[in-house]
Amino acid sequence: MVNMKASMFLTFAGLVLLFVVCYASESEEKEFPKEMLSSIFAVDNDFKQEERDCAGYMRECKEKLCCSGYVCSSRWKWCVLPAPWRC
């Protein structure tokens, strides 16, 4: 009877340990793609876009005025191409 209790306890402890190890490795695997993508798409200071006084196509125009050739959409508040049906 004692051997059965001990073997059940060891089995349960082994399953808990296995769960902890699997969870730890899975959480590391979830972080790996994020780290990889952030290193691939990291923006270097040399390649940053210049800050403009105006907003370009499909840029938010709440605080900035749209660049020439674009108008601020009254509905979406984005800079869009002018059209007769847009105000």
Curated annotation (Swiss-Prot):
Tissue: Expressed by the venom gland.
Matches recorded under Pfam families: Toxin_12
Keywords of the record: Disulfide bond, Ion channel impairing toxin, Knottin, Secreted, Signal, Toxin
The keyword Secreted is assigned to this record: yes
Domain text: The presence of a 'disulfide through disulfide knot' structurally defines this protein as a knottin.
Main localization of the protein described in the UniProt heading: secreted
InterPro entries referenced in this protein's UniProt entry, alphabetically: Huwentoxin-1, Huwentoxin_CS1
Organism: Cyriopagopus hainanus
Entry similarity comment: Belongs to the neurotoxin 10 (Hwtx-1) family. 51 (Hntx-8) subfamily. Hntx-8 sub-subfamily.
GO CC, one annotated term: extracellular region
Propeptide feature ranges: 25-52
Biological function: Ion channel inhibitor.
Leader sequence residues: 1-24
SS bond list: 54-67, 61-72, 66-79
Subcellular location field: Secreted
Stated name of the protein: U3-theraphotoxin-Hhn1a 5
Keyword Ribonucleoprotein (UniProt): no
